Amino acid sequence: MPLGLPLPLAASAHHVGCAVADLDAACASYASALGLARRTRAVRVESQQVEVCFIELRPGFYLELISPLEGNAKLARYLQNGFYHLCFLVEDLEASRAQMKSNRFVPLPAFESEAFGGNLCQFFLSPQAHLVELCQMGEGSFEALFIASLAP
């Protein structure tokens, strides 16, 4: 559920992203090992040069598996560790951006994400060098996209 300000962002936690080398194999093994049937087909996010798949861990919280498209060197370093980012849904990206910046989170360029129906998303680098993503979405919007993208 997206939140406006004042945050606690933790209440709007949406997904954790993990980088993988082989998206199809990772989606299949996670879904099978965890007994999770609800997952999306692969979605290309051209602006980030990645392909992603979401697996529902519990209602409203997902594991996003992320695989770099050919030539995407910036994601390659995350393949060593697996963890990539934590994402929160927000109602007002501009206001949330100001709050993140006031807490010394460095904003990276915002982008429209195909995985979120073209809605605006933005990554921030924390003072501890972790990536946090904020995506501006209306309430219930991602669930509708998720259902429409379920893998056969």
Per-segment meaning from a language model:
Residues 37-46, 110-115:
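Conserved catalytic-core motifs of GNAT/GCN5-like acyltransferases
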Residues 26-27, 51, 96:
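Residues within well-ordered alpha-helices
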Residues 32-39, 103-107:
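Conserved acetyl-CoA-binding loop of GNAT-fold acetyltransferases
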Residues 2-9, 12-21, 53-58, 63, 74-152:
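Vicinal oxygen chelate
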Residues 1-27, 81-88, 140-152:
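N-terminal beta-strand motif that seeds the catalytic metal site of vicinal oxygen chelate
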Residues 26-31, 100:
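Conserved active-site tyrosine of GNAT-family acetyltransferases
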